């Protein structure tokens, strides 16, 4: 897949194996991995539990590299970046720092929300107050730290804390911040100094992604025009310098979006949001150095809140719904036609590998399923976690890593 090019390009002077799950969404930032040897069904009691341990508040995904897991959690008034042995769950190192939640909205927990980024021998984390920390991934030594809200005055402060996971491109780390002149910024991974800052949009809780349009790398992000009646939009930028290449309207209530956009090799980009907008598909083409954006369809019945969207073939699968029921939905990326909607799980996130979906629903169920245009089939299911289990699972080889707001666990899902 073309997306794999980006992670190869961003390795900063490091040879050898790349991280197995280096960032939000996995190697290609699309919740699809190339794992083989996965079981076609689980025993009655569920897959073998390798270990389970207490962790703490937070929705950070679990990043993985060379037998070590990296994530974040909250302990009282502190945020904690933690590294754990993938085989045992034992702590290898952790780093705690003060991060008062203050007057931010607490009803869904205090975060942290972002996923650690692994790059070479370093790991990068961002907390609810937009503190970007760089650690030696082996020792946990803090190498440098940046207060993004302080460094970029007027940056968008989200009601539930900063939640946009960073992405790496070539020799830079790119973050959406919001604000005049610095809607999107790029920093040097070595020391955090500013490489570029561009554009005048507001930020949202969602994370950016990288695509390639006819040979040109582009950063895609959901941004907004700010103000009390924020108007959301999808933006394409040059990740080399932040230059704005194109925008397309995608209005949502409060100018918010959380779900990661989905890109296909056919040039179709799909963005789906809760908060009133639904899903929208854009066909991107490029000629004469200019990108042309054509809206293919819009469908308000596909409203993905904070869960994952996964494209397999010509269909995208995701839970559609805001704060009520969220039926599992299959939508044709070419036409916007809803093929089916079924209440198979509560609101759920998943990762796809070897023809199977590994599902974590918000009530704590962990499932093995097959999804196709013909419908959904739950093969196996076990109750393991507690509500709200909103973190997407991580799959590395035949090991599935899952968490909720109290615990983290490792499961063996191989044959």
Model-flagged regions — what are they?
Residues 1-4:
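Positively charged n-region of N-terminal signal peptides that target proteins for export
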Residues 6-16:
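Hydrophobic h-region of N-terminal signal peptides that target proteins for export
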Residues 15-415:
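Noncatalytic, solvent-exposed loop/strand surfaces
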